[in-house]
Amino acid sequence: MHSRHDEYHKLTRGERIGYGMGDFAQNLVFGTIGGFLALHMLTVNTISTATAGFIFLFVRIINVFWDPMVGTYVDKRTSKAGKYRPWLLRAGVPLVILSALLFAPIPGVKGSVAFAFIIYLALDLVYSLVNIPYGSLNASLTRDPESIDKLTSTRMMLANSANLLVYTLFPMFVQMAAPKDRSLKDTGFFGLELNLGNYTDPSANYAWFGVYAIYMIIGAVALFICYKFTKERVVATAEQTANVKTTDLFHELRHNRPLVILGMFFMLAFTFMFFMNTVNGFFNQFVVSHSEWMGAVGLVASIPGIAFPVFWPKLKKIFGKKGFFHLFLAMFIVGELLTYVWSREGMHDALWLAYIATFIKQWGLTSATGFMWALVPEVIAYGELKSGKRNAAIINAIMGLFFKIGFTIGGAIPLWLLAVYGFNESGAMQSASAIDGIIMTAVWIPIALAAISMVIIQVYPISDKHVTDINRQLDEIRV
């Protein structure tokens, strides 16, 4: 039986890194899917824009029913290795295999809507079996608030290290392996020139798969490290576990107001994040015509997410929880406005502007969307105080639903907007209308959603003092 002292365990650096490897793995696997699958589907796999959008939408609708079942199933069961940890291995291996299949150049299925749909659906269902237990594991490591803040900083540093591999190096590696239209190009890495090919041509299919397969091997190793170096301490009692029901989801939604508010913030944050990520490749390829810069610009943009999370706990103390989010959401908006300046005629070749705009934008984005995960354990504790049940997996399933709704909106609607604006999947050049559509989805819609997010987080009710009071009351109840 776990002691109260064990529940307030001060996490070591090794434990924080071990858990953070789970974020590293999932960003490597699913971040690449979110950032580049649409581009691959449309240009290399030659699936139409509208069809790809409907694939993303339909799979997310299924998630609405699937995720609560996963949350309930996980919360009702435990094993010798723990309640949540085993799923990192049980579902982790199928996750990386299915992910690789989405980019696999299999003869006879190129352009097959049925194949793309089935594999993407299976991948998304399996992803829930990894992501929901992983999110629940976060709240079971410790109840110490200081350790939770430090854990959030560490895991986001590792998550953004994976983003460096995804958004910075992945497109460059694929272009290095792409066979068509190869030429020596300035990468923007301080004069570094590389022989790069056209990665949006169907002939680049083996290049995509080869690079992604290597990423999946790294992701599988990272999931194993996460499993090996984590320990569950804050766990539900046997009575709480036995009493878990699927209807607990509706109870949490009705009575856990902080959960609903945080969920809405998650939904909006992931919506504007994936609006931007979905069309990032299109923006670089067709608006500013500098896809060869994606590696260099992405490298500069990755610095805030890797180097600065260590300062998050201190900044939260200075500005407060809500002030922290307001500061970095405002910074994101400023970066987006500078991105719009970069998109204007005559500014496309301004590499310095690309660096500054993306650096500021990503600093705001990674901080606001990274630190929000630190609020999930306190929402779980609040729910336990109100209901008497520690429904960690169910609450993480609810959070997963919110962020997947955002992921869906941010992944599907941009593609439909591009179709409305006249995007040509096979065209090397795009019309002025299509360019306007890319800018709308990459800049203006994310700005509007970020502004709404600032309003949502303002009404979030749990302060740091409330967290201390909640933990004290839970201690008294358990004693």
Where are these regions (language model features)?
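Membrane-embedded alpha-helical bundles of multi-pass transporters/translocases
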Residues: 2-479
